[in-house]
Amino acid sequence: SPFFMKGYITDKGFELPKTYNGYYNTGDLGNYENNLLFVNGRKREIIKKGGELIFLSVIENAALQNKNVLEAAALGKKDIIAGEEPYLIVVFKENSSPSNNIENLGIFLRERLRPIEVPKKIIISSKLSKTKSGKIIKKSLYKLLED
């Protein structure tokens, strides 16, 4: 709403916020049904592959259902043909075989996701950087996607 903020202070001075019909664009996505507002995610948590929208949280939630996965983060990477491709970075639980687990996780995900949602590549990490509140810092993970 117009009461959210007056504007931004930048190196150029004071700038008005970019609004749509007087409302600030937060990047949140949701829907309005039966006088209730549902927030479903954020615009940057969605990628477009071959014209279809993919919610990265769907991939993460599917991976976290696997008994050997401790943490998971799905990211989108630009692709010349598809537009964007989903990638998955996982931390496996201790005492589990990473090479065995990565193959099993691929099978596990193919059974639970639409074919278009299956990650192009699964990357193993020893840990995922987090904020003080425990949220995964996805910006720090993009370097792992570089070939």
Where do the protein language model's features map onto the residues?
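Short, solvent-exposed helix-helix connector turns and helix-capping sites enriched
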Residues: 10-11, 137
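A general structural motif at alpha-helix termini
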Residues: 18-19, 145
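AMP-binding/adenylate-forming catalytic domain of the ANL superfamily
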Residues: 111-135
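Phosphopantetheine-dependent thiolation modules in NRPS/PKS and related acyl-activating systems
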Residues: 135-147
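AMP-binding/adenylate-forming catalytic core of the ANL superfamily
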Residues: 1, 6-7, 22, 27-117, ...
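Acidic surface patches and DE-rich sequence motifs
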Residues: 10, 19-20, 79, 131
